[in-house]
Structures are given as structure tokens and as C-alpha cells.
Amino acid sequence: AKSVVAKAAEMICQGEVEPNKIGKTVLVIDEAQDMGVEEYALLRALMANNEEMRVIAVGDDDQNIYEFRGSDSDYMYRLTQESGSKFVEMTENYRSAHHPVNFANGFLRTIDKRIKSTPIISMRKEEGWVEVTRHQSKYMYQPLVEKLLQHKDKGTSCVLTQTNEEAVILMALLRKHGINSKLIQSMD
């Protein structure tokens, strides 16, 4: 069974949809880095049937967190290669403090095949806090929770773990200590 998106793309390509139903002057795509093969096929079908349609795709290839379900920033990159396309880098960050942004910039320089090339600049006054902690032991949770408790009044924190199991254990401990937490995990 095809998804609704794949079926719509197929119907448009085969001329099974009335032109007035798909005739658009502007198409805005938010979170374009999260497009998968089906969404891209639908976009291509709409573009092919609306030659004058203006496409505005907004996305951040560094924030593609849905690869596990088939999204690929390459589809957004392909749009930048279209004839007449214009690529605009938005480099000002109003959400994060200086240290996290600089840390992320350092990490992102090591990634191949990025669309953006200009480093991000924090526009906030706060310096922020970044700490990389590596533990060789399976008993890493308590020291990490204690460190987060020390910084809990200084803003939002993020913890990256190697496995989903580690993330679940850590979240339970944080909640036990009264720290509101949210689990974001892959489906692996």
C-alpha cells in the first residue's frame, strides 16, 4: 500500500488530477531537510505541472534527525541546484548561547557533504556552558545527574547518549531529582 504522498505524486504525474486542483503560485516547504523520497517526488510532480510556481524551501541540513524514517538533506540540496534557484544561508542564531554555538561549529566542520559553509553566530549575550564527559564505566549516570543538578538554574541542557537505553535510564534519574526532561530517540 502506497502512502498518501506517494499516491498523490503518482496521480499528478499521470495526469489524473485536475490542473486547477494543483495550480499554485507559491509553495513553501518548512523543515525541508526532512524530505524523503515520497515528499520529493510530490514536490517534483507539482513543479513539473506548475512551471511558474515559486518554491521556497526552508531547512537546516544540520538538523536532519529523521534519517531513520527516510529523510535525506540531499533532496533539499537538489533544490539549490535547480535552474534559477537562490541559496541563502541564515547564520544568526537567537536561540543558543555562545559556547554551545561555537562547540557545534567546531563539530560541524568535521562533517562532509554539508550544504552550509558559513559558521553560525550566536546573537545572545549569554556565554552558555558546554562540557564533554566521557565515562568508561557503566556507572556514569549519577555523576552526570549531579553535574546537571549544579547547572539546572542556568538554562536548558542537552545530553547525548550512545544508546536509547542509556537515555531512558538518565531521563528516569533526572525526573527522580525533579529535573523536567524530554526523551528524543532514534528507532534503533
Feature-to-residue mapping (PLM):
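Accessory N-terminal region flanking or inserted into the helicase ATPase core
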Residues: 1-31, 37-42, 57, 67, ...
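Short, surface-exposed connector motifs at secondary-structure boundaries
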Residues: 24, 84-86, 147-156
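Generic beta-sheet signal
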Residues: 25-27, 55, 153-161
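Conserved RecA-like helicase ATPase core segment
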Residues: 38-129, 134
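A short acidic, amphipathic alpha-helical/loop segment
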Residues: 39-46, 147, 169-173
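Core RecA-like ATPase module of SF1/SF2 helicases and allied nucleic-acid translocases
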Residues: 98, 158-188
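Conserved interdomain hinge at the start of the Helicase C-terminal
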Residues: 133-154
